[in-house]
Amino acid sequence: MRPLQEKIIAYEHVLPEIDPQKEIRKSIDFLKDYLKENPFLKSYVLGISGGQDSTLTGKLCQMAIEEMREETGDDSYQFIAVRLPYGVQADASDAADAIAFQKPDQDLIVNIKDPVDAMVKVVEATGQKITDFNKGNIKARQRMVVQYAIAGANNGAVVGTDHAAENFSGFYTKYGDGAADLTPLFRLDKRQGKAMLKELGCPKHLYEKAPTADLEEEKPDLPDEVALGVTYKEVDDYLEGKEVSEKAAEQIEKLWKKSEHKRHLPVTIFDDFYKKN
């Protein structure tokens, strides 16, 4: 095993193989324990895109909330799923299918187009130029602003979808989809999440679709694997301690090093990861 590979695996807590049922139970118990330790919290809020990660996370949240209601007799516990399109969502049918699979207590739709466009307009009025990439990050951050607003209105916590196959590369927006109160998928790679959805009886098309962040208007439906320069199979193999090609390993390690700043939020005077040896 490559030296850096061992370090990354240890940081991400990825197991070489999993029992899907055990990992489902582990995530549900984690979500329940957090509520028990924070009795002022009565809801979980999650943005639903229709992709694998939010579909799985949402299902786990609903299962945890239902168990909390049954165990405590407190019907105020709620899971709130939020669809957050920018204008018209290209894969809106997948998001609807994810909601149907999860059966959340509340299903909200908040269109972020107006606030995002307003933000771009007021910033560009100062003479600044907002690129398409920058605007994509504004979309991600606006979605999180909405989720925290809803959580604040419902004594809730915002749940994130971050997992090992994204975290290693920082494939998320700082203070956007990377912001959350807790992340029940942390420790899992992409294929492990897929195995858990299969175990839960999820519609096949929701975990077999090509993952895409879909933030940039100039690059609609850009697959994650194209953006990353490496396939999720290669990433999963690497995180599970298997051998991958030299090219794939170098790209994975390059992404890890380049995204280190996202795993130190904010950077403090005691951090030195950014200094070149």
From Swiss-Prot:
HAMAP family: NadE_ammonia_dep
SUPFAM superfamilies: Adenine nucleotide alpha hydrolases-like
One BP term from GO: NAD biosynthetic process
Catalytic activity: deamido-NAD(+) + NH4(+) + ATP = AMP + diphosphate + NAD(+) + H(+)
Sorted UniProt keywords: ATP-binding, Ligase, Magnesium, Metal-binding, NAD, Nucleotide-binding
Family as reported in the entry's similarity comment: Belongs to the NAD synthetase family.
GO CC field: cytoplasm
Organism encoding this protein: Lactobacillus gasseri (strain ATCC 33323 / DSM 20243 / BCRC 14619 / CIP 102991 / JCM 1131 / KCTC 3163 / NCIMB 11718 / NCTC 13722 / AM63)
UniProt keyword Ligase, yes or no: yes
Residue sites binding deamido-NAD(+) per the record: 141, 174, 181, 261-262
InterPro entries in the cross-refs: NAD/GMP_synthase, NAD_synthase, NH(3)-dep_NAD(+)_synth, Rossmann-like_a/b/a_fold
Chain positions recorded as Mg(2+) binding sites: 53, 166
Role played: Catalyzes the ATP-dependent amidation of deamido-NAD to form NAD. Uses ammonia as a nitrogen source.
CDD domains: NAD_synthase (cd00553)
Protein EC: 6.3.1.5
The protein's assembly and partners: Homodimer.
GO MF, one annotated term: NAD+ synthase (glutamine-hydrolyzing) activity
Name under which the protein is recorded: NH(3)-dependent NAD(+) synthetase
Any Pfam family matching the protein: NAD_synthase
Residues the record lists as binding ATP: 47-54, 161, 190, 212
Recorded metabolic or biological pathway in which this protein acts: Cofactor biosynthesis; NAD(+) biosynthesis; NAD(+) from deamido-NAD(+) (ammonia route): step 1/1
